[in-house]
């Protein structure tokens, strides 16, 4: 069915391109490239190029209900003196006039520049980078990861700084949009009600995409994206959700959220949504240096066994049938670990693996939406990391609007349990507002959770640099997001050495 849907979409685009009337874009009196450009899902010979045509982005786009002819160019230089590839495609009204160009035939491990054109208007120029050849020696990879960008809670200043970081790729770990209606008194305002329909989700994505700092980050390098919950509904789990609506209503809502997500992300046709389903977990290899296993902990999970919120785990948290990944994704991950020959193996995913205990003393209060609510599934994952003797496993996590560095163990209660991996938890871009450096209960939190090496509650992102001998993580933080001019600084740096699980703080 997926292949048939992909082929049908490609055939529809080809027919629309042939039928598109000449000179159609002369009707447009203002820019159609209001949402910028992006690239993503790189391969050794290509990437996905993205844009969406919209005259009035937050009012459904205001484009005519017809296909639009879009030309694209890929160059070896930023002046477009040496064209590597070029072509035409159709932006279809059925897909909100979004454009997804899947490139091939490019050289591995190099930068390219790209742009789109509708009639006489050129889009902004974007830059993308191909992956190295499979198994090729790679000495360095510099990337960032980010998550949780609630538009109302602050300015996307972090992305302005990120666009100047000289990164090969950015991993976005979810909560790219938030689904709630406008809340009075916040820094910026959502437009429209709580998201329910396809038009709602399209307009919210478009509102976020109009932000110039977010556009700059997307234009600077490719993004590899995955989602968390707010792309559809807070803390949803497969077809379970907090409103309690009939499953048929939520299925339609999830399908709307998934389609709008695809329309606004640089994803390949293999991720083309099929109703309320979308294939998002996938693997990327940077030569022999690093493999990235991008996970989806929302679409296939069972409902939270102990309910939502922070509480003492119930018996259901230890149910072996409870899962965040689903059996098929667990098998895919196990097979990937078995075949990986990379020196570093990185898991970009959504929710915290380490069990952060919020209660002092013998009582235990854990987040039931995180891996702590699915403890048998967490044990399976950590045992898999240990049993496969995977080269240097590192987990990248978002969701919690705070920075952490955690040692991961199969048994967190046993001080003698060996460290099997490192978890780098990145804070939010804006969610939670300005934040603070250290919470008042930091000493108690560290005492209750000795596997935590670092904790901070400012906004920002994490920049990582991987080499054959070590991986370094720099925690980049902003002083505030309630105003758009915050400087950025490195709050802390940690290093994971080759063959030595666990992170060590670097002196600053």
Q: What is each model feature region?
A:
Residues 2-14, 21-508:
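Metal-dependent phosphoester/phosphodiester hydrolase catalytic core
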């Amino acid at each position: 069915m997926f292949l048939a849907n992909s082929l049908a979409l490609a055939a529809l685009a080809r027919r629309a391109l042939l039928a598109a009337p000449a000179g159609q874009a002369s009707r447009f009196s203002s820019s159609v490239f209001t949402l910028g450009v992006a690239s993503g899902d790189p391969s050794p010979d290509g990437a996905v190029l993205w844009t969406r045509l919209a005259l009035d982005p937050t009012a459904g786009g205001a484009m005519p209900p017809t296909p639009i002819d879009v030309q694209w160019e890929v160059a070896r230089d930023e002046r477009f003196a040496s064209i590597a590839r070029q072509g035409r495609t159709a932006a279809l009204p059925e897909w909100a006039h979004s454009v997804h160009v899947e490139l091939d035939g490019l050289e591995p491990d190099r930068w390219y520049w790209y742009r789109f054109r509708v009639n006489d208007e050129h889009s902004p120029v974007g830059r993308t980078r191909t992956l190295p050849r499979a198994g090729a020696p790679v000495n360095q990879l510099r990337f960032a990861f980010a998550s949780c960008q609630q538009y109302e809670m602050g300015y996307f200043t972090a992305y302005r700084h990120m666009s100047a970081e000289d990164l090969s790729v950015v991993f976005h770990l979810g909560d790219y949009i938030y689904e709630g209606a406008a809340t009075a008194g916040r820094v910026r305002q959502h437009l429209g009600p709580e998201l329910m329909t396809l038009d709602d989700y399209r307009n919210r994505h478009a509102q976020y995409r109009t932000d110039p700092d977010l556009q700059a980050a997307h234009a600077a390098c490719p993004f590899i994206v995955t989602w968390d919950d707010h792309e559809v509904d807070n803390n949803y789990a497969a077809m379970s959700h907090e409103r309690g609506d009939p499953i048929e209503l939520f299925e339609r809502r999830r399908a709307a959220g998934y389609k709008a997500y695809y329309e606004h992300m640089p994803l390949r046709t293999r991720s083309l949504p099929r109703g309320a389903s979308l294939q998002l977990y996938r693997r990327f290899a940077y030569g022999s240096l690093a493999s990235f296993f991008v996970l989806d902990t929302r679409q296939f999970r069972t409902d939270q066994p102990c309910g939502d919120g922070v509480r003492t785990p119930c018996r259901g948290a230890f149910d072996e049938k409870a899962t965040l990944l689903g059996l098929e994704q667990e098998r895919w991950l196990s097979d990937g670990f078995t075949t990986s020959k990379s020196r570093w193996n990185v898991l970009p995913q959504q929710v915290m693996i380490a069990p952060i205990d919020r209660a002092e003393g013998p009582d235990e209060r854990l987040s039931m939406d995180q891996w702590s609510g699915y403890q048998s599934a967490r044990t399976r994952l950590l045992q898999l990391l240990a049993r496969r003797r995977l080269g240097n496993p590192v987990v990248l996590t978002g969701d919690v609007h705070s920075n952490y560095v955690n040692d991961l163990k199969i048994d967190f209660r046993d001080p003698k349990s060996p460290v099997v991996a490192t978890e780098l938890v990145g804070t939010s871009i804006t969610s939670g507002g300005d934040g603070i450096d250290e919470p008042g209960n930091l000493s108690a939190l560290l005492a209750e959770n000795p596997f935590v090496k670092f904790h901070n509650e400012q906004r920002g992102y994490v920049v990582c640099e991987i080499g054959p001998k070590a991986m370094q993580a720099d925690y980049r933080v902003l002083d505030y997001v309630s105003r758009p001019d915050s400087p950025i600084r490195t709050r802390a740096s940690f290093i994971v050495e080759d063959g030595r699980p666990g992170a060590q703080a670097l002196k600053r």
